[in-house]
Amino acid sequence: MTEGAITEGRDAIQDLRSHPAAHSDLAQLLTATGQDLARAPDGKGSPVIFRVAVEGERQDLDPIIQDEAYRIARELLRNAFRHAQAGQIEAEIRYEDSTFRVRIRDDGKGIEPEIVKAGGRGGHWGLLGMRERAKQIGAQLEFWSEAGAGTEVELSIPSSIAYGAARRGRFRLLTRKKTNP
């Protein structure tokens, strides 16, 4: 129990200290995070195969949305590497016209339905914190899990929110160029 509290405290401090650059690519950030977690010196289990897949044409994300999406995905990756006992973990980023999606999936032991429904285990704030972050940015966070069949979690953000500020900024630049001779 003490070790868990220390780990959660260390993660909270890292969250406060780490701010991904607004112009960093989300796929690169998640790749680096997954590689770091795969190298974690816990010595438990066999190596995990980790990959990041990107679908669709990359679009600039609103910097706040990108930061929150990264923080949620990072927490999901931490949970998968620490608790799933998975052989494979994948992060999938999908740039769609109507929705921006980030999915984290593993082939591990799964999460008990009661834990997902309750929003987490007593004394643990990871699932609850991710749901709150998602809600604050107008996103949905959905969990699918079966005992022994792994877990998949999807963060979905409407494109008007995910790409909104970036698109509006480009429009302002285009408008400004047209009005200035």
Descriptions of predicted regions:
Residues 1-181:
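Coiled-coil dimerization/phosphotransfer module
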